[in-house]
Amino acid sequence: MKIGKVPENVLKRSVLRQIKTKRKEVISGAGVGEDCAIFSFTDNMPLFTCMQEAVLWPDGDTAERGSSWDSPAITPGQLIQKCANNLAAGGGRMIAAMITLLLPEETEETYIKAFMSEAEAKCTELKVQIAGGQTRISNAVRMPVASVTGYGVPFEKNGEPRAGRSAVGQQTVNKCGIGKPRLGQDVVISKWIGLEGTAILAKKNREKLLDRYPAYLVDEAACFERFLSVIPEAATAVKSGVCAMHDASEGGVFGALWELAEGAGVGLTIDLKKLPLRQETVEICECCNVNPYELLSGGCLVMTTEDGPGLVAALESEGIPAVIVGKVTDSNDRIIVNEDEVRYMDRPKQDEIYRISAERQ
């Protein structure tokens, strides 16, 4: 199989169809496009949980680098952020994390300390407690593997965690812990697509890009990681009555749109020209022969709502760029409109980051 998430048909056939045991306490569980699971054990606050894992590819000697991480796809802080983003897309704010590290035999203690130092720095920023985990050395792995399990509580209507049963929690039988996309709803996207992948490309191809573009463009793109949190827009969206949310990440915006629609059994009509792109992403993707619509898009939140203009206005009032890009339809067709051209959206493919990495090997 190709590197990255398994194809959707494999996920459905060999993973989801094998899950047969159901419990009433699990009010939102495994499924296509689900960002997190939600549990309800009592009439009090429901518990949100999700898991993120990554193979870490440190560059050079960890002892010399200290906590300076350089990975083609992820850092310890980004791993924590991705977990928090998934919970936010489900309607919850992360409050605790469990971290598991599986490390090769040659790992030095300085490596572990550097990982935990950066992870703790991100958790401090997010007001998240590292509540436990496991650190194990194994000769079964060649590269460090990290797994983060995040735990969260529902956003309150003021954007803060709620201290009791919430309307959000009561709706979690539907998609994304908020609700199912419904016919006629507006599809809204926050910030810009391809941010995460653009930052990686800018760092990994700096010399090549500098032969073509000014340094300020490449440097700005490399700093796009500052946009990766979707917690602010998710909190604002909950206050504004959003119906469904999905965190765009691996597979790009096309993958996120497909998963949101597939999980709810609805169709979409999306205007390609309205999908928000930074000029840095356009230029760098052209130079690197990458499709920006299928590129890592962490930092971009896909939402559906009855009142698209109202949600956009609410987000923009908080300084968060947002735009209406399409509509939810009553068919299973996911259509991309580009002026006079109409085509059907493909099932999610291997993310462009993994594709170009494989081609260069």
PLM feature spans:
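Active-site-proximal betaalpha loop/short-helix elements
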Residues: 104-106, 221-297
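Solvent-exposed alpha-helices and their adjacent loops that cap or buttress functional pockets
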Residues: 29-31, 39-43, 123, 138-143, ...
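Glycine-rich phosphate/pyrophosphate-binding loop regions near the starts of catalytic domains
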Residues: 5-189, 194-195
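Acidic, Ser/Thr/Pro-rich beta/coil linker or hinge segments at domain junctions
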Residues: 2-3, 7, 11, 316-361
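Helix N-cap motif at beta-to-alpha junctions
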Residues: 304-310
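Short, acidic (Asp/Glu-rich) active-site segment that either coordinates a divalent metal cofactor
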Residues: 173-234
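Beta-strand->loop->alpha-helix junctions that form or flank phosphate-binding loops
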Residues: 28-31, 248-249, 267-276, 293-296, ...
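Short, ordered loop/turn segments at secondary-structure junctions
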Residues: 99-102, 134-136, 192-193, 249-251, ...
